[in-house]
């Protein structure tokens, strides 16, 4: 179910809770109330109390309504005291059919039949409901269906063609909700949600029932199982089922029916929401720990079939979360904050962290102020396969080391000698990763040892940071590569997968490995590149703690979950050597957290450190006082033990310092388009009633810069083609700016179809002028509102069906319908080329009119037309050229597009990579310099980006063939000199 719900006016906090932004205000009316008699005050307070008991909803168009109280699904269906209607009886009848099917089916068919039935209902849940919610989130499709069919309109108005369905829905919904609800007065969004709920009830109940019946069909007792194992299996299974039941009940207590049935896809509510209980224990508890009952039932049934189908269902639920719920939650509740406004820009230009050759770029380039970033730039990240850069020495070293490990692991025999060598190698790398890296960070925290070394040789703290990231990244990858290699050497394939617990061990081991991968990914998403590489050990000017993501539930997730994979390897291999490596890894990790991370965090953040995470707080609230005292005693024992270890290490430090320093010195130098879908459309039989001469499309847009218009007339052509072509007509070629909105004006007969639409295509995509055979890929706008089952197709529609006086070529007067629409943002092509608009008939692909072809182009920056000095380009001209282009790339949205060169980009630029990719594409064609999208996000404003372009131009100037940009090939005149 939807696990997060809020309303307009709710603001997202770092700890993940969403609370209403209440602003207390005093007015004259308040003072009048204060002067009333005591009786009047009591009446006012009672009225306010009654109002506070109500929940108010708000539709996207701003309509406010009272949200009636509703009952939960199980009570509605199974409680005899609840009134039943036709939909309840229908659901109960379907459930009864499932039970009867189990009773009457032969035992040989039960397992296969109920496996298919359960998979059908699971697909209906994750794929069916998922698709409906996805369409509702992006285009409000369900509400559009309801409005288009008029099923909620009173038949007495004559607009509802389904009076019987109207009466049935009215009786159904008012029977279920008897308080504070009126079918006629409720908004369409709320009524649509109520109907959607009934569909969800059917699918969820059948999904759970078919799963339980499938477990009954597969259940049994393994041969030779002892009574102790039987009791342990059932006790554990029942515990998991009861825990699952508590999770669901507590989650419903917190989020109520509104979020349980994804109400925020339809409307929002105005009320205080506090997320506690199970939502403090685990991320997405409804989909994570909320499926523990599946594994409990699998355990009680003692069937691998149940276990495998449970894993499949759980994976499908996570896919539903990632593909449907998370995007909607991000879009609805985590709106980007307002853009930062910079008033004082009298600062020095930022230094590129990846180069320190200051002599290459003239000091005059930094004469204008550049806004520095708040922390080290992460434009060239290290982690992730997509960030691998073979031009970077760190990535080269990592890849070569991995290839070497793979070759040694696969080409050497698994003899005891080799096994010992691999285990020893893994142990040494783990010791270095925890002890060696821990010592470096400890020295860096206390005396900036790492940074001082680079400053001694004239480097900056950014260079020290860059080298540290390479060292840590190489150490981390080598540690895990050596552990995997050792585990592989100790592993042997089982001869019989059905023997004992072999298969179960592999399943649990793989699950633990997947858990560690997910934990590491969540940690990286919460901390970012800066936190992952312990950036606050190197840059302590910005001490700020945020508990978001996985840190909302755990203070140190790497303490347990972060090492789940090594214990998964223990289960899979079942060897003492891997157990030793797992114990060593876990012990050293705990010591690293206690001796390195914790002291630094206390020193840097002090009292702002959180004592207990959400999970610990929940457990403490549920523990009896005696167990709480035991918990405190255990904490004291651990603290005393680590203090003893720390004192021991401090005493031995002088003996180890010289050797470690030598080791550090000796090793310091080591290191756009989706495929088009072909659509075949037949000519509509009613096209004969329309005159194509009544259809037309005209365009208006922003003209490109002067260099773009004259690029085709240059010295590249023959002598006769070096001037602009002579044009006999009055119309000139249509050329528009890259990313600029284009206004489309259309005309059509008065009786044109309300489902007509206009699409944008490349001229070369369609060979036929009568039928469009290529998908528009979302680049289309409907000519009329409420004609399609989506609101996205209406974005950009300005007007429609305005009657114009017109005349045909023969002089005959004729009235036509006209309209206007604007294509912008995602409805444009973000590339250069020749395009056209096509007017289509009746929701099909029959073409009624085609616009004039027009060209989208990016003019190259003309360096010869600007003033230059002895040091190169003037950055002000680059800034002036970039400003309109960047504004177009950011859809001219005032929330993200800068109005001046100093103004910061909106935060949405960091969240959605499409904006920065548009900018680097334009920069590449304007200046001939290719940047990574991360550069745009890291620079943060146009002034920084212009400085970086000038920097790149100056660095690349010696390799330019232009005399103004650098040394060119010597000529005869040079040779004579």
Curated annotation (Swiss-Prot):
Please list the residue ranges that the record places on the Lumenal side of the membrane. Answer: 1-88, 134-198, 248-280, 325-397, 441-471, 520-562
Instruction: Give residue ranges on the Cytoplasmic side.
Output: 110-112, 220-226, 302-303, 419, 489-498, 584-977
Q: Which domain of life is it from?
A: Eukaryota
Please note every region of biased composition (Polar residues).
Answer: 1-15
According to the UniProt entry, what is the EC number of this protein? 2.1.1.17
- Tell me what reaction this enzyme catalyses: a 1,2-diacyl-sn-glycero-3-phosphoethanolamine + S-adenosyl-L-methionine = a 1,2-diacyl-sn-glycero-3-phospho-N-methylethanolamine + S-adenosyl-L-homocysteine + H(+)
Protein name per its UniProtKB record:
Phosphatidylethanolamine N-methyltransferase
The gene name reads CHO2
């Amino acid at each position: 179910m939807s696990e997060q719900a809020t309303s307009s006016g709710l603001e997202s906090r770092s700890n993940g809770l969403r609370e209403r932004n209440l602003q207390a205000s005093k007015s004259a009316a308040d003072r009048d109330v204060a002067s009333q008699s005591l009786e009047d005050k009591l009446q006012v307070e009672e009225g306010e109390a009654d109002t506070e008991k109500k929940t108010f909803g708000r539709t996207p168009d701003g309509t406010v309504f009272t949200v009636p109280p509703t009952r939960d699904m199980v009570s509605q269906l199974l409680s005899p005291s609840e009134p039943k209607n036709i939909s309840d009886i229908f659901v109960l009848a379907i459930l009864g059919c499932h039970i009867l099917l189990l009773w009457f089916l032969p035992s040989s068919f039960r397992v296969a039949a109920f496996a298919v039935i359960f998979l059908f209902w699971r697909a209906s849940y994750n794929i069916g409901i998922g698709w409906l919610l996805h369409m509702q989130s992006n285009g409000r499709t369900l509400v559009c269906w309801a409005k288009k069919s008029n099923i909620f309109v009173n038949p007495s108005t004559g607009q509802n063609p389904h009076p019987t369905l109207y009466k049935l829905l009215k009786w159904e919904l008012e029977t279920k909700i008897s308080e504070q609800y009126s079918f006629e007065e409720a908004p369409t969004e709320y009524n649509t949600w109520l109907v959607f709920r009934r569909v969800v009830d059917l699918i969820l109940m059948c999904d759970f029932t078919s799963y339980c019946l499938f477990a009954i069909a597969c259940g049994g007792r393994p041969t030779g199982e002892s009574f102790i194992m039987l009791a342990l299996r059932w006790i554990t299974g029942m515990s998991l089922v009861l825990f699952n039941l508590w999770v669901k009940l507590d989650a419903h207590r917190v989020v109520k029916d509104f979020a349980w049935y994804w109400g925020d896809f339809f409307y929002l509510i105005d009320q205080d929401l506090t997320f506690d209980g199970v939502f403090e224990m685990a991320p997405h508890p409804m989909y994570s720990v909320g499926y523990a009952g599946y594994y409990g039932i699998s355990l009680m049934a003692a069937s691998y079939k149940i276990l495998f189908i449970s894993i499949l269902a759980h994976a499908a639920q996570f896919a539903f979360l990632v593909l449907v719920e998370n995007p909607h939650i991000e879009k609805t509740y985590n709106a980007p904050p307002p853009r930062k406004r910079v008033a004082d820009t009298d600062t020095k230009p930022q230094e590129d962290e990846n180069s320190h050759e200051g002599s290459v770029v003239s000091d005059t380039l930094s004469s204008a102020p550049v806004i520095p970033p708040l922390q080290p730039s992460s434009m060239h990240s290290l982690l992730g396969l997509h960030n691998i850069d073979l031009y970077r020495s760190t990535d080269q070293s990592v890849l070569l080391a991995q290839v070497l490990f793979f070759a040694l692991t696969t080409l050497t025999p698994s003899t005891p000698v080799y096994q010992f060598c691999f285990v020893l190698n893994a142990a040494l790398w783990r010791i270095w990763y925890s002890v060696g890296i821990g010592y470096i960070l400890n020295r860096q925290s206390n005396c900036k040892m790492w940074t001082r070394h680079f400053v001694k040789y004239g480097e900056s703290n950014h260079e020290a940071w860059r080298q540290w990231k390479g060292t840590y990244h190489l150490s981390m990858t080598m540690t895990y590569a050596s552990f995997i290699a050792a585990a592989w050497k100790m592993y042997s394939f089982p001869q019989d997968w059905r023997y004992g617990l072999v298969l179960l061990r592999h399943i649990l081991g793989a699950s633990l490995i997947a858990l560690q991968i997910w934990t590491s990914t969540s940690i990286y998403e919460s901390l970012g590149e800066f936190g992952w590489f312990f950036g606050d050990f190197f840059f302590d000017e910005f001490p700020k703690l945020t508990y978001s993501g996985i840190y909302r539930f755990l203070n140190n997730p790497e303490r347990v979950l972060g090492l789940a994979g090594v214990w998964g390897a223990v289960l899979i291999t079942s060897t003492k050597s891997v157990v030793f490596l797992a114990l060593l890894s876990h012990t050293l990790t705990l010591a690293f957290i206690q001796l390195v991370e914790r002291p630094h965090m206390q020193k840097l953040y002090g009292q702002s450190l959180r004592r207990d995470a959400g999970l610990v707080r929940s457990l403490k609230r549920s523990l009896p006082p005696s167990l709480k005292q035991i918990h405190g005693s255990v904490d004291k024992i651990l603290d005393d033990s680590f203090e003893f270890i720390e004192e021991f290490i401090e005493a031995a430090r002088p003996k180890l310092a010289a050797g470690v320093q030598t080791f550090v010195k000796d090793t310091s130098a080591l290191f756009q388009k989706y495929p088009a879908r072909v659509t075949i459309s037949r000519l509509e039989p009613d096209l004969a009633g329309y005159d194509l001469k009544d259809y037309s499309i005209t365009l208006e847009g922003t003209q490109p810069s002067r260099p773009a218009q004259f690029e085709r007339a240059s010295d590249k052509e023959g002598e006769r083609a070096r001037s602009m072509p002579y044009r006999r007509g009055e119309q000139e070629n249509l050329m528009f700016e890259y990313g600029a909105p284009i206004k489309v004006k259309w005309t059509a007969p008065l009786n044109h179809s309300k489902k007509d639409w206009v699409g944008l295509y490349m001229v070369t995509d369609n060979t036929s002028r009568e039928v469009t055979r290529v998908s528009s890929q979302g680049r289309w706008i409907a000519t009329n509102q409420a004609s399609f089952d989506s609101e996205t197709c209406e974005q950009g529609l300005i007007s429609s069906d305005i009657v114009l006086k017109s005349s045909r070529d023969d002089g005959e007067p004729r009235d036509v319908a006209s309209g206007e629409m604007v294509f912008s943002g995602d409805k444009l092509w973000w590339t250069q080329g020749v395009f056209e608009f096509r007017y289509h008939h009746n929701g099909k692909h029959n073409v009624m009119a085609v616009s004039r072809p027009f060209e989208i182009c990016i003019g190259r920056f003309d360096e010869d037309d600007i003033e230059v000095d002895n040091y190169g380009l003037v950055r002000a001209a680059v800034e002036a050229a970039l400003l309109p282009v960047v504004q177009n790339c950011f859809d001219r949205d005032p929330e993200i597009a800068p109005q001046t060169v100093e103004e910061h980009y909106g935060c949405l630029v960091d969240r959605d990579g499409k904006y920065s990719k548009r900018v680097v594409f334009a920069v590449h064609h304007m200046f001939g310099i290719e940047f990574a999208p991360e550069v745009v996000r890291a620079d943060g404003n146009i002034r920084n980006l212009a400085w970086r372009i000038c920097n790149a131009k100056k660095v690349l100037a010696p390799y330019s063939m232009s005399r103004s940009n650098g040394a060119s090939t010597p000529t005869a005149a040079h040779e004579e000199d």
